[in-house]
From Swiss-Prot:
Functional description taken from the UniProt entry: Catalyzes the transfer of an acyl group from acyl-phosphate (acyl-PO(4)) to glycerol-3-phosphate (G3P) to form lysophosphatidic acid (LPA). This enzyme utilizes acyl-phosphate as fatty acyl donor, but not acyl-CoA or acyl-ACP.
Cellular location(s): Cell membrane
GO BP, sorted A to Z: phospholipid biosynthetic process
Keywords: Cell membrane, Lipid biosynthesis, Lipid metabolism, Membrane, Phospholipid biosynthesis, Phospholipid metabolism, Transferase, Transmembrane, Transmembrane helix
UniProt cross-references to PANTHER family, sorted A to Z: GLYCEROL-3-PHOSPHATE ACYLTRANSFERASE-RELATED, INNER MEMBRANE PROTEIN YGIH
Residue ranges crossing the lipid bilayer per the database entry: 1-21, 51-71, 78-98, 111-131, 136-156, 159-176
Subunit structure, as described in the record: Probably interacts with PlsX.
Membrane topology designation: Multi-pass membrane protein
Name this protein carries in UniProt: Glycerol-3-phosphate acyltransferase 2
Primary residence: membrane
Highest taxon of the lineage: Bacteria
Entry EC no(s): 2.3.1.275
Pathway in which this enzyme or protein is active: Lipid metabolism; phospholipid metabolism
């Protein structure tokens, strides 16, 4: 029975605010600067490459660990449920009043890296290419997420992964809707990496 505690652990893993901690290390509250998100992109923009990479790794790791634990004890459905809980913990952080706090992209990549590594590599390559060409992280994130959603069905992955793709991709697109509107208006901030 105790193994069901993994799902609580997954949610709490997702809530670990790496970007917030990194900002505090630099004497900054990232919630009050940039996009206000405690996520990877805001960390890169505000804190520079070194801390940004650490936040990226931390955010991806919490998704990966949650998915691994869920899969280890409950198979594909467990991996997906635990992964989605980690994304929820990141995106609506309980330590900050459940307000929208991140978009869950890095955590999502951690999840699919564990459960669908081949698809992850393809999505990451597309993400890097799109961001390099457009300088829009939001466009790269949305297109990479949509790619995951398509490839899960093309590769006929287990039903659990298809359900995850529909939910997670929808979540990523919805959380980026204001970014998409700004891209269309030409007012979205382009990604310029601080050193």
């Amino acid at each position: 029975m105790w193994e069901y505690a993994i799902f609580i652990i997954a949610y709490l893993l997702g809530a670990i605010p790496f970007a917030y901690w990194a900002g505090r290390y630099k004497g900054m509250d990232v919630r009050k600067h940039g996009s206000g998100n405690i996520g990877t992109t805001n960390a890169f923009r505000l804190l520079g490459a070194k801390l940004g990479v650490l936040v990226l790794l931390g955010d991806a790791l919490k998704g990966a660990l949650a998915a691994y634990l869920g899969y280890r004890f409950f198979g594909p459905w467990g991996g997906i449920i635990a992964g989605l809980l980690a994304m929820a913990g990141h995106s609506w952080n309980p330590f900050f009043g459940f307000k929208p706090s991140g978009k869950g992209v890095a955590s999502g990549f951690g999840i699919i890296l564990v459960l669908m590594p081949k698809i992850t590599v393809m999505a990451i390559v597309l993400f890097v290419l799109v961001v390099f060409l457009t300088r829009y992280v939001s466009v790269g994130s949305v297109l990479a997420a949509l790619t995951v959603g398509i490839l899960v069905f093309l590769f006929n992955e287990p039903m659990a992964y298809k359900v995850f793709a529909v939910i997670a991709v929808s979540g990523v697109v919805i959380r980026h809707r204001t970014n998409i509107q700004r891209v269309l208006k030409g007012t979205e901030n382009k990604f310029n990496l601080k050193r």
